[in-house]
């Protein structure tokens, strides 16, 4: 007799994966094993730190396994001991070998934070904001040997608001993914959901954000710069140079007024923010900053301290 729910092995590592694992546990999907990345040294003290998924799984009483690489033959042997129906992959952080994908009857079900086939790759949330998309979403899909190219089981859209940052949208999509994952798993297990192949001709890609992309080019349009800042807030953070130091920029707002300043020129330094000229002649209001070695703060607070020298006529950029 077929059981009501499929037994799964869960692969995940960062905060994004926790809502999905929590949903599986709360909805009574049997999680046989949690596979996550090894503990790593972090911070100035280089203390050994467990991945967020391991911390949650341990509190939930789930068994954890932390292989250095999935290509080790011992991994296949270990996972083969569990009579699981499928693998569930949520931001594990390493490619899943074909041998593992094929080891269970249902294969590997993946949660991807974009509307595939758009934004395949490592940074779909960042790229969607950066390019000025008005919507994004979550796709539940089957893994194949390609990069996010497998058939789709389920998909849900969400609007990208003008003040959404990477951090805000990350949390929204993590929760949305968890909510549609469980139903997709159950329906696919029961044979009530047919995978739909992606249209590969419509595929776009979302490579990881490089350090050079984080440097603000003030000759670009106000909208482009605003989107960049939101797309990498809180980390790694968009930055410029001021007084020979790195100055990270947060909480931007496009001001629909034409300014006469040069790109990167401070036009106004007021309690409600720094107004900077951009390449299209439109102002960008900056409400939060973080000088190298300091904490993030409102511009009004910064202006009372080291930011006193950041006055109209100052040119941001360069080194």
Model-assigned labels for residue ranges:
Residues 18, 22-26, 77-80, 98, ...:
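Amphipathic, non-transmembrane alpha-helical secondary structure
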Residues 1-44:
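N-terminal Rossmann-like dinucleotide-binding module
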Residues 5, 26-30, 37, 86-205, ...:
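Donor/substrate-binding cores of folate-linked one-carbon enzymes
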Residues 219-319:
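An anion-binding loop in the catalytic cleft
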Residues 37, 41-83:
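N-terminal glycine-/serine-/threonine-rich beta1-alpha1-beta2 phosphate-ribose binding loop
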Residues 13-16, 68-71, 92-94:
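Short beta->alpha connector loops
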């Amino acid at each position: 007799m077929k059981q009501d729910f499929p037994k799964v092995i869960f692969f995940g590592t960062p905060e994004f994966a926790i809502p999905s694992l929590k949903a599986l546990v709360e909805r009574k999907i049997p999680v046989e094993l949690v596979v996550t990345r090894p503990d790593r040294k972090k911070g100035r003290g280089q203390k050994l730190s467990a991945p967020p998924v391991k911390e949650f799984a341990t509190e939930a009483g789930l068994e954890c396994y932390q292989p250095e690489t999935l290509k080790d033959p011992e991994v296949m042997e270990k996972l083969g001991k569990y009579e699981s129906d499928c693998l569930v992959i949520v931001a594990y952080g390493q490619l899943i070998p074909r041998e593992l994908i094929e080891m269970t009857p249902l294969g590997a079900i993946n949660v991807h934070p974009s509307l595939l086939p758009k934004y395949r790759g490592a940074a779909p949330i960042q790229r969607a904001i950066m390019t000025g998309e008005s919507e994004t979403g979550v796709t539940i899909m089957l893994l194949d040997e390609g990069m996010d190219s497998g058939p789709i089981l389920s998909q849900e859209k969400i609007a990208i608001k003008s003040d959404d940052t990477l951090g805000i949208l990350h949390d929204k999509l993590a929760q949305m993914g968890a909510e549609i994952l469980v139903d997709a798993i159950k329906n696919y297990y029961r044979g009530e959901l047919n995978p739909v192949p992606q249209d590969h001709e419509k595929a776009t890609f979302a490579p990881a954000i490089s350090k050079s992309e984080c440097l603000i080019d003030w000759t670009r349009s106000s909208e482009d710069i605003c989107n960049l800042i939101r797309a990498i807030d809180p980390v790694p953070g968009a930055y410029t140079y001021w007084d020979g130091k790195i100055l990270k920029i947060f909480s931007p707002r496009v001001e629909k007024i034409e300014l006469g300043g040069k790109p990167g020129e401070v036009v106004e330094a007021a309690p409600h923010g720094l107004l900077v000229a951009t390449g299209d002649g439109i102002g960008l209001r900056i409400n939060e900053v973080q000088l190298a070695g300091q904490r993030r703060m409102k511009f009004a607070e910064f202006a009372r301290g080291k930011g006193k020298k950041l006055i109209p006529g100052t040119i941001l950029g360069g080194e």
